């Protein structure tokens, strides 16, 4: 009787569900381990083979930790708000709730068929009002703390679609859907003040066990730089332009200023004769994405405003230009151009015949900008100074003139938090007719997303919620004042910022989570997910966590202690899997043909967990063959337990068994599952060669296999005569003294020629080695009739006899 995966997998999945095998108790006194997966967006396409890779890794660790006596929290949920469901609703007129519900059912079925040990009683869904009640509650805390504010922000407005698009939905200035023109236009938006936490987000990275590459991505995104704020007065205007620069020492080389086309001063300072050209340029640049505008390969463009600024240290007039390579979202949206020492400024100055003044010696500015170090020249009081000294001196001079100060700048922008969408958490704010605004009282949360059979763009740039009068219009019962609810909704990031906290106490209707439980479970011990979330999701979650820490809601400064990014599973030809290429592998098909255990084993055996590796049907077949070999070793054709498994130890497998326990334990700790599986294969090969298999070794092997292939693990454990699930059985231990052979083979040489090979106990003394060598029949023949001049014994290696 062969290994019937369909029967066995169904049997144990039912057993786990019926017995709630993986239900996590809040035993606050027990040592804990919190293993977290990045929860999925439940798309219409269902699970693909990339999902189970990370999920299998956390599941192996969770099962391993349970066997080590840990209280393990291993939950799963759904990041279910988001654009695809909204798009489906717009295209079909159907409510996204039903679409989302069906997708979740599919995902859940697929995940359960893979045998993951989740505690389904802790399942969360970001679209559940009992969940987003607390997302809204967190928003109110941010608002009360002054961290949520309304600002005019340029957005991607598509008149034809009557809606605002995300950057991802705009390709080359037109909408991805339909190819309609898209314009940048300012709109009132909710923004979160993440910049207030920039330094802490940067500094606390050092305390985390994260891949260095991810930490660097976050550091670069935050982009802390030290420099100066310089203020340039505008000629004949009661206004000035603030610039942030990391090189205030080059101020003597400034020959013009450049503003972003959206800068608030552009319209005010532009002269009459330049107005038309400036307006046209502003309109043209509104059709470009930030990426296009900052593309270094593209030809620089710009327009002179007709206005001039004054250099605060030289008193010279500097023409003010606008150019789209300067973004309003970075720094102050204004640049002091030093073309002699900046490549972009050099290119711009060369194109528009603007002066190029050298202020740092060492280059040839007739040919190109010099960006190296050198002595300052043509720089007044800075002449002769090196870079560092000159920067300090320049700031000193600016401060003395009241024209600047030392400043730290961040590339990080405040987080644009509102979306002009229906399918998201309603923002709990009311705008009153007297111009004030208030948050919805906490006791009235959740503010429910209204159900509607007509989800269509408002046409005004507001979300479709603006069409629903009974939602929008409110009256204050106490004062009779009229108000309008906020119609923007939260971004998909909101629900995923804090979901790991709700798993800790998912049914608490009085608070986000019980403080004692938070204290027990935080921080997350292991977080596994794709590298595509390296910056935004992790940064936003860390930001919210720090705010909640400051409010006394959570007890730790950081949410995720250890982070690991699994690699990507590619198609057979090393290409990314995609529907268009027709190379997507559906896990349902594999579970049906090979079994869930085979899929889990194969994805862990493909290579290192963080590597990008191509899918291979041969590799999949090989993994199945290994499980078949294991089955045949343990189970006879008639289904009975193999009589090779015995209660007496003949010591033949001592060494390989103990080596296997040691190797698998170490590899599970370091997430090197591929090499752990290799060692399990070595053990099985030796078992096939052995006369008998000591039953405790057979059981130990099954315990090590079970976290990777849990269904066959449970079945073999059961067939070995055990009554309980293998889930909470103690993890095997190894005996150091058995990691090496108890006997060694030594050679015996007579006059340099090998005459015998002996197996002797490892701890045999030199004297005993000599005696054993001299007793050997071959040795006796070789030294017969000769005088023994010398005997040299090297423990565990050889005995050399010199005889004449």
UniProtKB/Swiss-Prot annotation:
GO BP: leucyl-tRNA aminoacylation
Catalyzed reactions per annotation: tRNA(Leu) + L-leucine + ATP = L-leucyl-tRNA(Leu) + AMP + diphosphate
E.C. code: 6.1.1.4
Amino-acid positions noted as binding ATP in the UniProt annotation, renumbered to this chain: 579
InterPro entries in the cross-refs: aa-tRNA-synth_I_CS, aa-tRNA-synth_Ia, Leu-tRNA-ligase, Leu_tRNA-synth_edit, M/V/L/I-tRNA-synth_anticd-bd, Methionyl/Leucyl_tRNA_Synth, Rossmann-like_a/b/a_fold, tRNAsynth_Ia_anticodon-bd
GO molecular function (one): leucine-tRNA ligase activity
Localisation per UniProt entry: Cytoplasm
Motif extent ('HIGH' region): 40-51
GO cellular component terms attached to this protein's record: cytosol
Sequence motif 'KMSKS' region, residues: 576-580
Keywords for this protein: Aminoacyl-tRNA synthetase, ATP-binding, Cytoplasm, Ligase, Nucleotide-binding, Protein biosynthesis
Family: Belongs to the class-I aminoacyl-tRNA synthetase family.
PANTHER family per record: LEUCINE--TRNA LIGASE, MITOCHONDRIAL, LEUCYL-TRNA SYNTHETASE
Protein name: Leucine--tRNA ligase
Organism: Staphylococcus haemolyticus (strain JCSC1435)
Gene: leuS
């Amino acid at each position: 009787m062969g290994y019937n995966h369909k029967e066995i997998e169904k049997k144990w999945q039912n057993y786990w569900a019926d017995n709630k095998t993986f239900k996590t108790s809040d035993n606050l006194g027990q040592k804990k381990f919190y293993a977290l997966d990045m929860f999925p967006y439940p798309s219409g396409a269902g699970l693909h083979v990339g999902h189970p890779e990370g999920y299998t890794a956390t599941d192996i660790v969770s099962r391993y930790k349970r066997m080590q006596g840990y209280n393990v929290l291993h939950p799963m949920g759904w990041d279910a708000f988001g654009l695809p469901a909204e798009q489906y609703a717009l295209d079909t007129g159907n409510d996204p709730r039903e679409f989302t519900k069906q997708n979740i059912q599919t995902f859940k079925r697929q995940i359960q068929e893979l045998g993951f040990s989740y505690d389904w009683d802790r399942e969360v869904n970001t679209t559940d009002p009992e969940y987003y009640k607390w997302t809204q509650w967190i928003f109110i805390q941010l608002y009360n703390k002054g961290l949520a504010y309304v600002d005019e922000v340029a957005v991607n407005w598509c008149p034809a679609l009557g809606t605002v698009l995300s950057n991802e939905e705009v390709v080359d200035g037109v909408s991805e859907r339909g190819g309609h023109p898209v314009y940048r236009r300012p709109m009132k938006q909710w923004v979160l003040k993440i910049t207030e936490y920039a330094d802490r987000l940067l500094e606390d990275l050092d305390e985390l066990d994260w891949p260095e590459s991810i930490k660097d991505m976050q550091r670069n995104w935050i982009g802390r730089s030290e420099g100066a704020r310089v203020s340039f007065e505008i000629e004949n205007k009661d206004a000035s332009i603030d610039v942030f620069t990391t090189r205030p020492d080059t101020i003597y080389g400034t020959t013009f200023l450049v503003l972003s086309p959206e800068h608030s001063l552009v319209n005010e300072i532009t002269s009459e004769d330049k107005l038309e050209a400036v307006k046209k340029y502003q309109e043209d640049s509104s059709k470009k994405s930030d990426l296009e505008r900052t593309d270094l390969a593209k030809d620089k463009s710009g327009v002179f405003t007709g206005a001039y600024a004054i250099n605060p240290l030289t008193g010279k007039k500097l023409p003010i230009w606008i150019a789209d390579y300067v973004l309003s979202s970075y720094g102050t949206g204004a640049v002091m151009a030093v073309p002699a020492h900046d490549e972009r400024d050099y290119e711009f100055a060369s194109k528009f015949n603007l002066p190029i003044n050298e202020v740092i010696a060492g280059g040839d500015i007739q040919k190109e900008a010099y960006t190296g170090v050198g002595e300052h020249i043509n720089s007044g009081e800075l002449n002769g100074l090196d870079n560092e000294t000159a920067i300090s001196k320049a700031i000193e001079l600016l401060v003395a003139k009241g024209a600047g100060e030392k400043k730290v700048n961040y590339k990080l922008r405040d987080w644009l938090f509102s979306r002009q969408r229906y399918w998201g958490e309603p923002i709990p704010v009311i705008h009153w007719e007297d111009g004030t605004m208030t948050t919805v009282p906490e006791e009235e949360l959740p503010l429910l997303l209204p159900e509607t059979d007509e989800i269509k763009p408002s046409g005004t740039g507001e979300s479709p919620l603006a069409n629903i009068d009974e939602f929008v219009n409110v009256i204050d019962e106490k004062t009779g004042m009229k108000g309008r609810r906020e119609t923007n909704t939260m971004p998909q990031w909101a629900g995923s910022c804090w979901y790991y906290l709700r798993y800790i106490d998912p049914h608490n209707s009085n608070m986000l989570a019980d403080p004692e439980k938070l204290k027990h479970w935080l921080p997350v011990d292991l977080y596994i997910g794709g590298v595509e979330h390296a910056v935004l999701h992790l940064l936003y979650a860390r930001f919210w966590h720090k705010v909640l820490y400051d409010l006394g809601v959570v007890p730790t400064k950081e949410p995720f202690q250890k982070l690991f990014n699994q690699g990507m599973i590619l198609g057979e030809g090393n290409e990314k899997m995609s529907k268009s290429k027709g190379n997507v592998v559906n896990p349902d098909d594999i579970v049906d043909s090979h079994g869930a255990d085979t899929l889990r084993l194969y994805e862990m055996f493909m290579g290192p967990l963080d590597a990008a590796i191509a899918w291979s049907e041969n590799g999949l077949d090989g993994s199945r063959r290994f499980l078949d070999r294991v089955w045949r070793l343990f189970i006879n054709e008639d289904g009975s337990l193999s009589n090779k498994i015995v209660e007496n130890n003949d010591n033949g497998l001592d060494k390989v068994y103990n080596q296997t326990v040691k190797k698998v334990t170490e590899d599970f700790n370091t997430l090197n599952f591929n090499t752990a599986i290799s060692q399990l294969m070595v053990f099985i090969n030796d078992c096939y060669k052995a006369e008998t298999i000591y039953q405790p070794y057979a059981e130990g092997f099954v315990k090590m296999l079970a976290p990777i292939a849990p269904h066959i693990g449970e079945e073999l454990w059961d067939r070995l005569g055990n009554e309980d699930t293998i889930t909470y059985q103690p993890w095997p231990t190894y005996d150091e003294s058995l990691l090496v052979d108890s006997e060694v083979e030594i050679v015996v040489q007579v006059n340099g020629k090998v005459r015998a090979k002996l197996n002797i106990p490892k701890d045999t003394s030199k004297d005993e080695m000599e005696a054993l060598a001299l007793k050997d029949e071959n040795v006796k023949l070789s030294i017969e009739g000769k005088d023994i001049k010398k005997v040299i014994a090297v423990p565990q290696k050889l005995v050399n006899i010199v005889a004449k």
